[in-house]
C-alpha cells in the first residue's frame, strides 16, 4: 500500500507531529470527517491469550500509546487462517483466532501503522492504557 500518496495518512502524521495527543479529551475527534479521525480511549489491556487479531478494509490504523508501552500481535492478513465470525462492514472489522503472530512493542512517544493487509492484536499488556487510535481512510 502506497501510504506516501495517501493525503489523509500524511495529514495524520502531521497532526501527530503538531499535537500533544495527551491533552485531547477521550472520544472521537473528526480531523477530516469520515476520511480521518482519532479516537482517544482508555482501554483495559489483555494477555496474549485474550487478545485477538483484527483487520480492517476501509481504514488504516495508526495507534499511539500515550500512558504506557503497548504490545501488539502482528501477522500478514494473507496468512490468517481462522476467522472469528464474519466481517462486520458497519464497524469495518474482522477478527481472527490465530495466535501465531509476531509481537511488537510500541513505546510511549512512538506510533505504529496497520494497513488493511496487516492483522493486529492490540492492547497486549497489564492494567489500563490511555491511547490514540487514528482511523485513516484508504485512498
Name what the model sees in each region:
Residues 33-35, 55-59, 65-67, 88, ...:
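Short connector loops at helix/strand junctions that flank enzyme active sites
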Residues 58-70, 76, 85-93, 135-137:
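Short, conserved beta-strand element in jelly-roll/cupin
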Residues 58, 96-101:
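Short alpha-helix capping/helix-loop boundary micro-motifs
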Residues 38-56, 66-80:
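Conserved short histidine dyad/triad with adjacent acidic residue
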Residues 104-119:
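Conserved metal-binding segment of the jelly-roll/cupin
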Residues 1-40, 47-55:
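A short, N-terminal "cap"/entry segment at the start of jelly-roll beta-barrel domains
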Residues 111-113, 127-139:
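A short hydrophobic beta-strand segment most commonly corresponding to one strand
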Amino acid at each position: 500500500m502506497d501510504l506516501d500518496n495517501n493525503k489523509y495518512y500524511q495529514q495524520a502524521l502531521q497532526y501527530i507531529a503538531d499535537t500533544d495527543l495527551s491533552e485531547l479529551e477521550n472520544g472521537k475527534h473528526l480531523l477530516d470527517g469520515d476520511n480521518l479521525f482519532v479516537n482517544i480511549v482508555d482501554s483495559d489491556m489483555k494477555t496474549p491469550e485474550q487478545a485477538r487479531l483484527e483487520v480492517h478494509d476501509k481504514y488504516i490504523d495508526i495507534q499511539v500509546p500515550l500512558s504506557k508501552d503497548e504490545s501488539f500481535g502482528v501477522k500478514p492478513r494473507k496468512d490468517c487462517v481462522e476467522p472469528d465470525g464474519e466481517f462486520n462492514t458497519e464497524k469495518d472489522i474482522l477478527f481472527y483466532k490465530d495466535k501465531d503472530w509476531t509481537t511488537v512493542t510500541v513505546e510511549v512517544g512512538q506510533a505504529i501503522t496497520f494497513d488493511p493487509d496487516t492483522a493486529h492484536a492490540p492492547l497486549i499488556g497489564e492494567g489500563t492504557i490511555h491511547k490514540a487510535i487514528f482511523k485513516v481512510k484508504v485512498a
